A protein has these predicted regions:
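Sec-dependent N-terminal signal peptides
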Residues: 4-14
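Beta-strand-enriched cores of mature, soluble protein domains
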Residues: 21-169
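Sec/Tat signal peptide C-region and signal peptidase I cleavage site
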Residues: 16-20
Length: 169
């Protein structure tokens, strides 16, 4: 199902008439802190995070595009079982290291399977990137195949940056 979803996103992305305006980007996200303020379990013993925050170092690059900064992520909806299966919806603010007024603000929808995470992320640019949008996928390397969890919380990002579409044109 996930593969079909990503194939459909790719087809829509690359067959769009605005394809020439899109810049393919890639990069990395490394979590630097994770704080849970309040959580509870439901009748199925799944964990719900009412308030959790993650900070990360972000690097996104391509020919003609670059962004390096920090991410502040609020986990707005998190439902996880004891096997690492679940769903997380986040609100994100990415701030540039060189200019705090340059930001990307957006959200992500993530699926977890046995602790391995796949997300689709959408952002709107501010400051230097005013009028731009960014759409990314976030894929965690499968560390769930081994018993020892030595994942450094380093995630690969891939996607596009493009002009924000204008409705009615």
């Amino acid at each position: 199902m996930k593969k079909l979803f990503f194939v459909l996103i790719g087809l829509v992305t690359f067959t769009s008439p605005a394809y020439a305006q899109k810049i393919a980007v890639e990069g990395f996200m490394k979590h630097t802190s994770f704080k849970v303020f309040e959580k509870w379990r439901d009748s199925g013993k799944r964990k719900h995070f009412f308030s959790a925050k993650v900070t990360s170092a972000i690097t996104i690059y391509s020919e003609g595009f670059g962004f390096k900064g920090t991410s502040e992520t609020d986990l707005g909806l998190s439902i996880l079982d004891d096997n690492g299966n679940g769903r997380i919806v986040t609100k994100e603010i990415w701030t540039s290291d060189k200019d705090p007024s340059t930001r990307f603000k957006g959200h992500a929808d993530c699926d977890l399977t046995s602790g391995s995470t796949t997300c689709v992320m959408w952002f709107k640019g501010y400051g230097e990137f005013e009028g731009k949008i960014m759409e990314l996928t976030f894929n965690e390397k499968d560390a769930a195949e081994i018993d020892k969890d030595d994942n450094p919380n380093l995630y690969m990002l891939e996607g596009i940056v493009m002009d924000e579409p204008v409705v009615g044109q």
